[in-house]
Amino acid sequence: MTATAGTTTARTTPAVLRRGAWLASALFWTAFAVVESVNHGWPAVALALAFLVLPDLTFLVAAADAPRMAKGQPAPRAVPCYNAMHRALVPFALAVAYTVLPVDWPPAFAALCGWLAHISYDRAFGYGLRTKEGFQRG
């Protein structure tokens, strides 16, 4: 079957697959955070929600510089904090450590699930780490 003029055909690109995988990861970590929150009460709910929002609060590190920056661009001095909070390896390694070590405080694990969900949603929607000037990496 051939495509007619003016129509487009769907393509599976690595970027689409990558974003789909990040979306699946986001849904998994969100579901895990909800399960942990339901099982362990308000402290788990509060920490899961806090860590779902916390990574984007790094924009406030240089809030005074915001009027001089482009929309959605953090100031260069906020970029290291932003990138540190948006690396998936950090909360994932902490979650692995939580499961291996004799730590038993479920709200901490719910917080890590919320943090991983945030990072995964960002990647699924096309947001990622920043350059040192604060622009999206390509």
Where in the sequence are the language-model features?
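N-terminal membrane-targeting hydrophobic helices
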Residues: 2-138
